[in-house]
């Protein structure tokens, strides 16, 4: 019997791809000889490659008609048995449909963000799990996987890792904490000034250097963090994906909101202190499979064996995007975050 041929579709973004890895690991472990082709955006090819899960990685520019036509033709010629759309958008569901893939698996209407998308699937899965990574695993189960999710192992590219370690050595930095104040939704962000105060406390009490990670369009954040950090002089990092993976992999701890770098740190094996407000950590929080986070009786901190998630009690979950920190983010006090960092760092020593 010929081996199965799967098309896995997850175009972006960083955190969403990370939360798709456990489901695709389960697929790979269930079908070790299968061909798994992963379709993604060019920006995330390195990330997908780092997982070692895909036989081939195809990329498409979703805003380019020529790129769409090319990828649909390639999918048609490849004669896939099954396409699994882990994203649930028109742009992620359409290629396999237009290419005529026989079995197309995706989420039922209640779990997709765009109305009508499931009409393009032959198999519609009603997700019952709380966390998005486990929901993705339900798609893998429908495709025939023996388990919904499995443990993820990714590593930074060796060339980036070597260069980054030399960068740290040249600056006399050994142990450090990464502060990640940015995010696509400012409503999910903790104020940068509080990150600055946290940086000072980490330096004074734990004798650790801080590295402020920020991305495109976030050039205002580092100055605000530095301006509130007294004379601790945190390092600033605004690098490409490969060096970012190295930065996160070697950190003692990563502090940030519900953003891609935080979830990438978890996949790299680094403990995190995650600051949550409008989004629900039970659905979008740090994910370590069977070691997933559970709520403490106070419901203000969520802890697993490696991570601590802080969220104010009685927050109403919302996915409405805003340009200012959600009020629930302002309820998270610096002292509480520092204590969480101290506990995580102590647990590693």
Q: Residues of each region from the PLM?
A:
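Catalytic machinery of carbohydrate-active enzymes
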Residues: 1-349
